[in-house]
Amino acid sequence: MTENRDNKTSQSEKTTQKKKKKKFKAFKIILITFITLIVISLVTAIGITLAIIKTSPDININEIIAASDASKIYDDKGELVDSIITSKKKILVKYDEVPENLINAFVSIEDERFFKHSGIDVKRIAGAFLIDMKNIVSGKPALQGASTITQQLIKNTVFETHGNSLNDKLRRKVQEWYLAPKLEKEVGKKSIMEAYLNTIYLGGRAIGVGAAADQYFNVSIDKLDLVQCAFIAGLPQSPSVYYPYSRTSKKDPSKYINRTKTVLAKMKENGYISQNEYISALAELDTSKSTVTNDESIQTLGQYTIHKPTNIDEKYNFEWFTRPAIERVKKDLKDIYNYSDDEIEKLLVNGNLKIYTTMNKDLQVSTQEIIDNDEKLNSLSSSKNNLVEPQASAVLTDYHTGEVKVIIGGRGTQPALAYNRATNAKVAAGSSIKPLTVYSAAIDSKLATAATVLEDSPLPEAMSKKYSAPGTNWQPKNANGVYSGYLGLRDALKNSVNVYAVKLEDKIGLNTGVKYGEKFGLTFDNVDKNSMAAIALGELNRGTNTFTMANAYGVFGNNGMYSNPRLYTKVLDRNGNVLLETKTQATQVISPEAAYIMYDLLKGPVKEGTATRIQHTYHSDIPIAGKTGSSTKFKNLWFCGLTPYYSGAVWIENKYGQSIYSSDAAALFGKIMNRAVENLPEKEIEMPEGIIKAEVDRVSGLLPTDLSYKDPRGSQVYTELFIKGTVPTEQDNIHVSTKVNKYNGRVSGSYTPSFLTESKVFIKRQSDSEVPLDDDMYVLPDKDKKSSNKSKHNHNNDAKHDNTNNSEDATNEASTEPSPNTDTVPEDSTNNLDPTKNTEKKPSDKKNKKHVIKPIIRPKKHF
């Protein structure tokens, strides 16, 4: 028994030992794995760090101090055309000239252990690391500052073009840690502080403390007192926030005043000033003068007046183009690298960037000359507030690439930062909007074709009310005051017929017009989006400009693609690295087929429509197309168009109602485009395969019949372009043939002798118009009207007179006069009488010499 027990105990101990061995083995494996991972991580981290360090740039203090060359601007051929005009001011100072209070103020607020560390502050880094860990866990932005003044100097002068992503920041931080001690060993603290104080941006125009002393207090650096030193030292953290003349500071100066107090508190904390000095300084800040005066152009800091920087009046060589290009570069730096405004400003002023624009210098120069010296504009020229009138703008774009080639923002000599009408104006587009929001929208959505016929006549009451304000009756007018009657889309666009555009927009829907307009790059406010006058006729509330319109019209030559406008191709940093680069980005706005049809339609105004004056100024064999536009009272005059090379827009501001029209804008456009293509080979835009040519009837927009060729105005058959699948399938139903009395033109009837009758072709109308229409004389005459067609065209455009000549309904009763040569033979109204009705001849009235017949009914199918 005892032996068995011992055996069991022995076996149990062995089992326990085995379990312990297994646990130890598992622990050993885990420990080895953990250590291995740590080692691998450390090795990897060291490797990455060494790799980052290896790519660190070489630096020396002389290059850092001199690293303030302004960025350069180049044209599309790589020729230097401008240098960044620095609004900044720099007054270099020596270390020994700087007040001790100013140095101590910067050290206290920016790097309190500056004179103790060797370039990096380990204690500060550790504190920042803990904060970063908390921020990462909580999802807040990580990477606290912890930068010493030495690191800031390196960052501001060496790494200014590096990105602001997390990876970029980590890389830059490692390189700063490596370079900072290296720099301190080479030059020492005084040289580093001097370089820092001379290169730091301090708001307004001030680069460096010398310029800041002059700008804010109008004193030299050695004359700054304690409060002034504290104010200047508080600026670097965020010069735009603490700048006294920012919008926020004008309303609430407490931001920069409280920042100054913070600097003073840190100076006291670090033992640089005494308690009494601190209290005295606060007292100076807390006087009644520390609030904004009634004059918001003057800011104060306690008892001190803070001077406002004077404006820079230096102009760029190519002011109209260079400034928009720089603004685009600024926007992209902010979007891509998340740079602050202050960082971008410093980079442009000191970064020695190379900005390659899309500007064609020769075209820019020639276009400015053409606009400045235009004979018609100069004949009307007057000077208002030292500004030549009328003003104008123009833009040319290579729509294939999106590269903007010309921007002209005004006429005549104008100052720096003058209002750029090409990029900043917001004016009504007039009829130049129609190809974008009406005709393209209708054709691309296949709700209409280039042959679609509508009646050019006053809006029906229901349609008018839909777009009228309560209690009003909106009726758009055509420019010539004439209504055409049946009208096709091609002719409506060619002659800029307003009523047709409104009716077509109503057919496709206002929202459709808005949607297409936005795809073309237009922007609408809520007023515009609900206004037929805005979307169909261009009476925009928000407005547009030549920059937008020039790029929009490029769609018609680019297979329906809208190329995002580009003002620069690339930006290089001082080391030749690509900082920014643009590529052609295009989006499909309309189909290639719709685009080509629109391009073909837009040749109409130039050849025989509203823009024929362009033929006197454009002499190239390269095709040109486009559309005029004018807003109410001819305040804004437009021509927007394209060739197979460029699209463009010209706008003339007729502010004072002078004798100038959209045709003058077309003539000006012709001069500009003539110069643009004069040395280019002849070229045409190719027609896509998805387009079909088909013969149609111009009056109905349908397939022609024999009567289409016999219209009294001549054959109404022509060849039109259609997107495949949109060719009409129905035959013309507007033309009719009937017999008429040769002598009075009225429809002959059963009593009209055959020798007095002849067959004629007419058009028929579904309903009568309240006003005369141009094609009334070709409408099938009613039985009850005497020379009704002719009488309508002998109108004087008076509404009351016009209404007396309206045709009556076919079922109305009436009497007819006999032909002068057939006194005893009354005329029937038609030879298509309803066979169920009888007509009866009554005795003639000798006195009135008239023959009266019974009422007749005209079958509806004939009308």
UniProtKB/Swiss-Prot annotation:
The keyword Transferase applies. It is found in: Cell membrane. It holds the Pfam family Transpeptidase. Residues 837-846 have a biased composition (Basic and acidic residues). In the N-terminal section; belongs to the glycosyltransferase 51 family. Cell wall formation. Synthesis of cross-linked peptidoglycan from the lipid intermediates. The enzyme has a penicillin-insensitive transglycosylase N-terminal domain (formation of linear glycan strands) and a penicillin-sensitive transpeptidase C-terminal domain (cross-linking of the peptide subunits). PANTHER family: BINDING PROTEIN TRANSPEPTIDASE, PUTATIVE-RELATED (PTHR32282), PENICILLIN-BINDING PROTEIN 1B (PTHR32282:SF11). This is Penicillin-binding protein 1A. It comes from Clostridium novyi (strain NT). The gene is pbpA.
